[in-house]
Structure formats: C-alpha cells, structure tokens
C-alpha cells in the first residue's frame, strides 16, 4: 500500500539552521543563526545591478540579521523552534511566537496571545563599497513593517551597518507583525491579516501541494515528502528575466535557473503538475539567442551566456530538454506543447553542430568545460575543445526525441530524417571513439584519446542502439568494483583512475542524476534487474540523510562539505525513482495475487 506525504510527516524535519524556511514563489530565506535564539533573512537574488559579480550573492551578508523575539521590557527571548512546511513555532517563556508567509514577500510573525511582545532586527537596506576614488552606496531592497496590534513602542535607530528596528505591540488574539521585503520601488505596507488566517492559508497551500503527488512505498515516504517540499520551496515567481514560475537548483547556492537542471526538475513536476513541468522548459526557451544557443543560466536581472573562467567563451548546458519534454508528453500528452517547443529545440540542436564541430567530422565538441555541466571533471584538465561521448550521446537522445515529436505532429518524412541522422551519428561515434581493446568510448582531444576513465565513457549505452557485445563490455565496466561498482555507485571518475577524488564535485563523487541516466540506459538495453538494483541503491543512498544533496562521497556515501543541500535535481530524480519503484512493487503484488 502506498503512502502520500503529509505535513505531519515533515514536522521538525526542516532544520532551519541549514535549510531556509521559505515558500513557493518567494525569494526570502529565513534561517536560525548558528543554533542561537536569533534569526536572519537572506535574499535568493543575485542583485548584479548592485554587485556585477554574478557569484557575489554567495558571499553577501543577510538583508535582515539579529532578529530577536522580545518581551515587554525589550529583552531578547530564548526559544526552541519547531518546524513544519507551513509554519515555524518558537516556544519562549512568555508563550508561542509563530512565523508563516502571508505571501511571497511578506513574513508574518504571530505574537503570543495576551502579551506585550514584539521583534527586534537589524536591517541593511544599502550596499556600500569603498573604491579607489571614494565609495559607492546603492539601495538593495525596500522594506516595510506593520502590525494589527496596538503599538506600544516603535523605534528605528541608526547603527553601524544599517538600522536597528524594534516594534512592541499589545498582543490580543491573532496579533501579527508583518515584515515585507519588496522587489520593486514600492513602499506600500501589506495588509495585516489575523495570524490564524495567515497560517490557514499557508497550511492549505502545502496540503494542496502534497495532495497532488502519487503514492510511494512507505520506506521512502519521509524523504519523498521532503523532496516534494524542496520542489515547492525552491520555486520562484516570475520576475525580470525569469518569465515563468520556475525552480532554482538551490535557493542558497544556485540562485537562478540552469538549463539541464530545469529539464530534470520537469521530470518530477510531471507527476503532480504538468503545466508547471512545461513551464520549466519554457523558462529556458524564452531566452534563445538568434543563432539557436540557449543560456547556461537565467536569473532575475540577467542571463549567463558567457563565462571568463577557467577559459573565456560561450556557455550553455547539455541538450536534454527534448528528452525531458518527451517524458512529460508520455505522462501528460499535449500536442500543442510539442508543436510550440519543437522548432526552438531543433534550432538548439543545429547550434551544437554548427558551432561546436571545429574539425567538421560530425562529432560534436565541448568548447567550454562548463557547457558539459561537469565543471571540474578531469576530462578538461588537458585543454579544450574536447569531443566527449556524453555530449554526442545527449544529441543522439535529442534526435530520438525529435523523431517522436515529428511523428506526433504527423511529419513522417522528418521523423525518418531524424532517425537516419541519429544512427549516422552513432556510427561516427563508434568509428572514432570506440576502443575495442578497452571496451569503451574515449573522449578525444586533437583526435587523440583522453585516457581518463569516467562513466561518460560508457554513455553510448544509453542510446540503446549498440551491438549486444558492446553493451556487454560497457556494463562490465559499470559493475567492476575497481572502477564504477562497489558500495557507493556510480562514481564520476573510475576508482582506478589517478584523477579519482571521491569528495570533489565531478572528480569522483556520486551524482543522483548520472545514476538516473544509467538506470534508463540499463532498461533500454534489456537489463531490468540491474536497473532496479541501481534505482534501489540510489534511493537508499539519498534516504540515508535528512536532506537532499548535490553529490555524495563515493567511498562513504556522506555528502562532502562542498555539496549544496536542498538540491533540486537530487530531489527530482529521487521522486521519479521512488514513483517507479512503487509502481513496480504494486505490479508485482498484483501479479502474485
């Protein structure tokens, strides 16, 4: 019997010292400060109009800090916090304070009934910087605060680094202090509703969210519920260049939308909200360049098409939008959506071949390492460009999806063309990259093999079009404990390779999305039992932890310190795998009856 997650299932699962309390659509992140009785609020915004460095947000201090809950005398209260997806509850010596989102820009603090109580916080509404010739001051965001209680005191005091704000109210029943952070020039305070109404609205939003998701096996229910919370919590509303409601990989570490992340996020959303899944794809396609290229990343104030490190060049991400769109169509058919996106995806496909094949041999290259999504992989240690099996496999899969799209749209001649092109490309990969002695596909640099052993050397398995003998050789590598097998699989560099580092990003750790791709590859080649084992292994690896992480140590299964938490595609593929596992077990039960 499958279970569907509930709010109770996630009570106190969200650790706000490490994981932001936020809400669907919001760019406000509430944290507990260093396990103390204080809070702070960060902004999930790059704000490049203030600091042009596109990664400055990673180092930016909180917008609001030293948030304290105070008593009648203005004393800061110690608290114990309890978390739920819809509300934080702070137990103090004078009663319960609560915090919920009234809307995506308004944090509502519910005061303990029958008390004189309030909040105090430090606001830093300006950014300043000393320069060689002087200094710069820029506004960050506007802030308003107000209450539906009788105000006993209200002070704004200039202090070093900003302003200290203190507001104390007579808290009869349902009294609230609202703090709103505005993304525009507005300074109109938000309407203050009774806290019971605010909490009911917040609770109903999350109940509605969880009601839409399919059931899974009970052993995965808690992490499954948390993964769906991440899929909701990481959503941001349309603003600026973000044209649709879309999901950030992490509101802490990855502010913006990334191309291939968006495709993987759509995998999960298709099970609960197909329109939201479609909008993940639309949000990326909205910014296609005239030459067909799609951006690496999109954020409120801009787009990332080029990067100047480790080399300068154009940057995108692997072309898996068509693959994801086909999966979405299989779950929730929409011919009009296929008709809408097909021409743009064809242009993106053409860009890869026209701008990333310097030797004109029909094998596509990565010109910038970051276009691979495998930023620090040892595949790029020896210079660029690199003709890698993974990008050419992605393109084969894209053309496989195009074949289906053309058939769906009644364009049979075009479907036949894509089928021929896909098989022709695969033949070139076999001719140029296959090493019969090694039993794998090498990446090429200056037409010479790069003998760095990674799972990406096995990627053509995923096409489902190789000979049985080739498939067998590739799977042998996958299962070899000295290479990619072992207790924690699949490492992103072979354990036998001198570049292997189990803790460092794409130089060895296990990534859930790569495992997902190989589950599909094994299924396509008729190895269902191995696919099930890898699926169960991946589900168990992720379930061992209280959060969903970017990657996992290939020796210990633990998330390294550098791995982002509340990570989107790990949550997404966990959801998709858990649903598949449940459907398989349900089918097995029916067969046995």
Where are these regions (language model features)?
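Terminal accessory carbohydrate-recognition/targeting modules of carbohydrate-active enzymes
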Residues: 1-219, 260, 272, 524, ...
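N-terminal start-of-domain structural block
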Residues: 149-180, 218, 294, 299-300, ...
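Short N-terminal secondary-structure initiator segments
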Residues: 186-195, 231-255, 311-350, 438-447
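Structured, solvent-exposed acidic/aromatic patches
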Residues: 385-392, 412
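Extended glycan-interaction surfaces of carbohydrate-active proteins
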Residues: 217-256, 285, 290-311, 357-387, ...
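Extended, well-ordered alpha-helical scaffold segments
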Residues: 194-201, 205, 219-226, 273-286, ...
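Aromatic-rich carbohydrate-recognition surfaces in CAZymes
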Residues: 255-368, 389-392, 396, 509-525, ...
